[in-house]
């Protein structure tokens, strides 16, 4: 039986990505403080909830870590398997899925924004800057952070396809769009109810808590 080498390399890339994605600093920070971050605040073990619960420094650390882990997974897979034309895309997608659905945390993970940013950064600084610009415009217009990963998970794969001509890789990247949307259904419901946090919480946390009707937990 002949073994398909590229298939094995893609599988290895997926394993690297998923294992890296499961590393969750927000959850660890919560444990060190004596609580499960998935049961406090928004319930999301990611940067935004860490900012709400522990402040900007902790939240920015979580964001930087999550961006970095995706960038490392993509870069490492591309370096290890240069002849596999979808190694980076497979690793990046698996990292996002590992972050959102980590086996180590009962498949209850984050929502993928920072990891999406990290995989894009690993492919190209130009791609990252372009997506950052357009998503910043969206964020300024709507003020809802949750809309960024939803649109990014659709927009970047299309952009990547036109930029590289690697539509197979783009299809792999685009496969996270539905899981990302599913992760944000509750956010969309809260937008409709006027209870979703806006980016304003970065400088007006108390105002956002009052506006949304959330109670800050001790």
What are these regions (language model features)?
Residues 1-12, 74-90, 121-127, 160-172:
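Helix-coil boundary and interhelical linker segments in multi-pass alpha-helical membrane proteins
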Residues 28-59, 109, 189-215:
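Cytosolic, membrane-interface loops and tails of multi-pass inner-membrane proteins
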Residues 58-64, 68-103, 126, 135-136:
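Nucleotide and nucleotide-moiety/phosphate-recognizing core
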């Amino acid at each position: 039986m002949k073994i398909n080498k590229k298939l094995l390399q893609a599988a290895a890339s997926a394993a690297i990505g998923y294992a890296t994605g499961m590393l969750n600093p927000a959850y660890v920070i919560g444990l060190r403080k004596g609580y499960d971050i998935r049961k406090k605040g928004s319930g999301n073990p990611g940067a935004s909830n860490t900012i709400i619960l522990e402040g900007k420094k902790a939240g920015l650390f979580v964001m930087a870590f999550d961006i970095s882990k995706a960038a490392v997974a993509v870069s490492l897979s591309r370096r290890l398997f240069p002849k596999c034309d979808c190694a980076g895309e497979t690793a990046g997608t698996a990292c996002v899925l590992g972050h959102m659905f980590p086996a180590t945390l009962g498949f209850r993970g984050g929502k993928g924004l920072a990891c999406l940013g990290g995989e894009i950064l690993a492919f190209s600084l130009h791609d990252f800057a372009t997506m950052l610009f357009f998503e910043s415009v969206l964020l300024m217009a709507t003020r809802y952070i949750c809309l960024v990963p939803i649109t990014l998970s659709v927009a970047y794969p299309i952009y990547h396809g036109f930029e590289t001509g690697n539509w197979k890789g783009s299809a792999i990247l685009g496969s996270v769009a539905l899981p990302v949307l599913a992760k944000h259904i509750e956010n969309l419901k809260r937008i409709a109810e006027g209870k979703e946090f806006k980016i304003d919480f970065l400088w007006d946390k108390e105002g956002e808590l009052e506006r949304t009707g959330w109670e800050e937990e001790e």
